[in-house]
Structures are given as structure tokens and as C-alpha cells.
Amino acid sequence: MVREEVAGSTQTLQWKCVESRVDSKRLYYGRFILSPLRKGQADTVGIALRRALLGEIEGTCITRAKFWSVPHEYSTIAGIEESVQEILLNLKEIVLRSNLYGVRDASICVKGPRYITAQDIILPPSVEIVDTAQPIANLTEPIDFCIDLQIKRDRGYQTELRKNYQDGSYPIDAVSMPVRNVNYSIFSCGNGNEKHEILFLEIWTNGSLTPKEALYEASRNLIDLFLPFLHAEEEGTSFEENKNRFTPPLFTFQKRLTNLKKNKKGIPLNCIFIDQLELTSRTYNCLKRANIHTLLDLLSKTEEDLLRIDSFRMEDRKHIWDTLEKHLPIDLLKNKLSF
């Protein structure tokens, strides 16, 4: 972080992209400005956005590879220049772009002699390769080469325990971090009591999303983190009132969902996707990871099922019900339901 004094004045709060370029297929750069900010605010925003950009953005990568008739990852395969470990490292570097949730299967099946690149990966429709020229292996002899792959969308660095899998599959330490680097600098301008700060934010991504898309997603994630405090303020709750009180799961949530299902006669709930419910990105992502794509999928789950979803919180449950209550009777069902 760099702090400098510069001349100038900014009258209204605004943000904009002041520079954007594509250095390569796997390196995008963007530079953004936010101003005016009071003294100290630029640091607060800069630190929060940097952490969110580096740690909260989801990415898609290869998490497992299955070879046939390979005893261990340090083996060499006749007719292939690289060892199994080198092939795994090359697969780890493959950059993918997708909006998938859950685990998907992919594969490679080619005949040598030839170079194998990312272009040879057979992917599900929802996944695409950012750089098809990324190398995987070099077949030096006319052999058949097949690998089964597993693809997953996640966030951060996922380390898999090394085990001796009997079926020839090997875990890959996945790096689900589309943002490669973030830097911010603060410029102070003005005189005396009129001083304010300008925040410059630089973002480098791996090409699976643009810096602008990464900034948007990081901002949404930060907003979701603070929503519980906003709800607490709206409901007039205080820490003193709640610090010694335990709130058990409310059975009324499940009861209301049951009533809603009883009133769904003639309504094609399998045609109503959760994208239409205006859920927060956090709640939406939780449901998608649990393979809940439609309203029918959601209503088939019990409250206990929802609470078992990874990262799903009581606040998410309340938000889902509030959203159903707000939108379904009016916008989607077109008739008033009584609960």
C-alpha cells in the first residue's frame, strides 16, 4: 500500500475503471478509482476489498485425475515424456471458466504420437477452457492415452490428503483463486479540513473472469457479510437482549413450506428457478452447491436438510422464507396464499 499527496479535488462520490487491458489469455489487468473518501476510509475499503478479492471469489478447476494401470503418481508411462506427477501439475494449472455448482466429470482420450493440450479435454457444456494451448503431456509413441477428470467450483486453496487410491485416481491440490494479485494505493488531496482520500485499486485475474467481474463479486460477498447487522437494526434487536438467549430452529418455517406445497396445485414449480427469487448471492450459492435449482427442489427439502448445507446459516433460512413470502404469492403464483 502506498500513500501519496496529490493536488486536486473530487466533488461527488464515484467509482470508475481508469485502465483495463488483457496481457495474455491468463492475465487480465484492471485499475479502478473510488473517491472522495474521508481520512481513513480508503484504508478500510482497500483492506476489505483486497481480502475479499483474494479469498472469497470462487473459481473452477480440476480436483482429481484417474489414470488406468498406474501404480503411483511418481510412475512413468511408456510412450509419454512426462511422469504422472508432471501431468498432475500441468492439470492443476489449467484455467477453467464456468458457473457450475457441485462436481462435474471430464475426460481426455487421445492417440499418439502428439502433444496433448487443454483443448483435448472433453468438458461438460457448462465449462469452458480459458487457454486451450496450455500443455498437459507429450505422447512420443502411438499409444492410447485416457484420463478421467473431476471438476469442481470452490474458493481458496484446497489441499487433499495423499492416499494410495486403488482405482488409480489421484487428488490435485486445487487453487480456486481467479484473482492472482491485488494492490491498492491511497492519494490524499485538498487542504486543511477539506482533505479527502482517493483509493486506487489494481486487480490481476487469471482470465476466468475480468477484474470488473471480480470486483463486483467481492463487493457482493462483503455486503452479504454485513446483512445480519442490518437486519438486527431493522428488527430493533440489541446485543444485551440476545447475548444470553438461545433461539432454537423454528418449526414454523417447515410448517409454512408444507402449507405452500399443499397450495401448489396446478403450479409448475419445477419451472420456477431460484434465479427468479432475488436471493442474495450468498444464499443463492449455498442452494446451488446443494443442487437446488428450482422451487420444487427447494420445497422438497426439510429445514434440517437446509441447515446441513455447507455454510448455510439461520439467517439464510429466514431470508429464503421472507423471499418466498414476498414474491411467490404476488409475482409468481398470482394468487394470495394464507399461512
UniProtKB/Swiss-Prot annotation:
GO MF, one annotated term: protein dimerization activity
Keywords: Chloroplast, DNA-directed RNA polymerase, Nucleotidyltransferase, Plastid, Transcription, Transferase
Top-rank lineage group of the source organism: Eukaryota
EC number(s) recorded for this UniProt protein: 2.7.7.6
GO biological process: DNA-templated transcription
Its biological purpose: DNA-dependent RNA polymerase catalyzes the transcription of DNA into RNA using the four ribonucleoside triphosphates as substrates.
Family: Belongs to the RNA polymerase alpha chain family.
Domain notes: The N-terminal domain is essential for RNAP assembly and basal transcription, whereas the C-terminal domain is involved in interaction with transcriptional regulators and with upstream promoter elements.
Name of the protein: DNA-directed RNA polymerase subunit alpha
Gene name of the record: rpoA
